[in-house]
């Protein structure tokens, strides 16, 4: 999770431990430097899905925040631990060596902020995106008009699809578009 890959040889095995000697240590720069997902809180199963797929696609920071219409339940310690286990599994799956962070508040980002907006026709995200970037995605029930106005002042209103997407689908498709533009 710190951009290092170690090769090791097992030197001893006991009933409860294995001891290793590191024989090679290599550093790998992250392929994506800053891709932030600011997602209104979701139900736990959907949150886990977004964390798994977002990690595989290159999200560097997850910010799950309260909105007026989002799931207001704060995850338990066990649920947070499960999210970290999901991240580790996703890192192994995609070969990433940099561990994304999780925060439970809105980010203080001010560069390349893209707000997934359903209120009217907007520019498609793939036409205007660049990294570093922050993608703001709403909850299952959407944002209130006050929240929409606030986010429109922060950044660019964009469309992710000509269709109305589920919150987790919007997050994943937006991240995929941003990550693809980083290549």
Segments from the language model and where they lie:
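Short, glycine/serine-rich, charged loops/turns that create anion-binding
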Residues: 42, 69, 120, 140, ...
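Structured adenosyl-cofactor binding patch, chiefly the S-adenosyl-L-methionine
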Residues: 145-183
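RNA substrate-binding interface of SAM-dependent RNA methyltransferases
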Residues: 27-112
């Amino acid at each position: 999770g710190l951009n290092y890959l170690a090769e090791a040889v097992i030197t001893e095995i006991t009933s409860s431990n294995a001891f290793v000697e590191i024989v090679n240590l290599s550093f790998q720069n992250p392929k994506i430097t800053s891709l932030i997902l600011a997602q209104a809180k979701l139900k736990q199963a959907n949150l886990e899905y977004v964390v798994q797929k977002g990690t595989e696609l290159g999200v560097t920071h997850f910010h799950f925040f309260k909105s007026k219409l989002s799931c207001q339940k704060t995850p338990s310690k066990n649920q947070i631990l499960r999210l970290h286990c999901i991240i580790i599994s996703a890192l192994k799956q995609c070969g990433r060596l940099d561990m994304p962070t999780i925060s439970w508040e809105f980010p203080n980002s001010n560069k390349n902020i893209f707000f997934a907006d359903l209120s009217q026709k907007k520019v498609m995200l793939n036409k205007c995106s660049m990294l570093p970037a922050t993608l703001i995605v709403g909850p299952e029930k959407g944002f209130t008009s006050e929240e929409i106005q606030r986010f429109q002042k922060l950044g660019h209103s964009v469309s992710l699809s000509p269709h109305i997407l589920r919150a987790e689908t919007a997050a994943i498709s937006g991240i995929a578009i941003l990550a693809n533009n980083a290549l």
